[in-house]
Regions:
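Long, charge-rich, low-complexity alpha-helical segments
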Residues: 1-156, 206-257
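Low-complexity, glycine/alanine/valine/leucine- and proline-rich hydrophobic stretches
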Residues: 161-229
Length: 257
């Protein structure tokens, strides 16, 4: 007899209606992976058929949903009840939670949702950019890095420097105007009528939990996304067909280092 095996099986049954259905249909096969006594196995078989187990399942799912809704609020709002239900139920069906920490669970769910968007199994025009933005904000908040405002000196040999994004910053490419989309979402307006283009949203951790956001147009977007610390400004200007002043302004502002 293994109390740990019984507790694990019971936890899995409470968390997964799909597992309960499988256990009710074929208990021997579904419970074979747990270290159980005959008595424990019979108890679990009975529980799998007991409709009252739905109540703790609902409580568990409410808690898991709160972990996502409190950390990825705009993504959840954009999804709406139907889309959120579809994604979360599919995500929960992948297996039990691996953590009870809100941020870790949000990042894990976000990674799952991004995977669904990129393989085409889930469709949403705005979710990818919203998820990437909120996930970047969560990551920055935990990083301990801080960006400080102020004018920086631009080196005379900038053309030979290999710039990269400030470590306390993240840049998220957007296909729509971030300011317009976020304003509409926060005001409860439908996400409709937005033209596609080359936009980006820069996030900067400023310390003490403060997050600075700034939107950029096409030229700055290309420069910020391409500056990975491996190519010189001269090479980037030639490759992207950009004037050197774009990089000079980003360095002066401290977005690139």
């Amino acid at each position: 007899m293994s109390l740990q095996g019984f507790q694990q099986a019971l936890t899995d049954l409470v968390m997964s209606p799909a597992l309960r259905a499988r256990v009710a249909e074929d208990p021997s096969a579904c419970l074979a992976g747990y270290d159980l006594s005959d008595l424990e196995r019979r108890r679990l078989e009975a529980l799998a058929r007991d409709p009252r187990v739905r109540t703790p399942t609902l409580l568990h799912r409410s808690f898991r949903l709160s972990m996502i809704a409190n950390t990825l609020p705009r993504s959840c709002k954009a999804l709406g009840p139907r889309g959120l239900r579809e994604l979360t139920h599919a995500y929960w069906g992948e297996g039990p939670p691996r953590t009870m920490q809100f941020v870790k669970e949000a990042l894990r769910f976000g990674g799952y949702a991004l995977g669904r968007l990129r393989d085409g199994s889930f469709q949403h025009d705005f979710l990818e950019e919203l998820l990437e933005t909120e996930m970047a904000a969560l990551t920055l908040d935990r990083s301990g890095a801080a960006w400080e405002a102020g004018e920086r000196a631009v080196p005379d040999d900038l053309a030979f420097r290999t710039p990269r994004l400030h470590p306390a910053c993240r840049v998220i490419p957007w296909r729509h105007d971030p300011d317009a989309v976020l304003a509409a979402l926060d005001a409860g307006r439908p996400l409709e009528g937005f033209e596609e283009g080359e936009h980006c949203l820069l996030l900067a951790a400023a310390g003490a939990g403060k997050l600075i956001t700034k939107t950029f147009g096409t030229a700055e977007r290309r420069a910020l996304l391409a500056a990975d610390g491996t190519r010189t400004v001269g090479d980037l200007c030639a490759e992207l067909d950009l004037p050197g002043r774009v990089f000079a302004e980003l360095v002066a502002a401290g977005w690139l280092v």
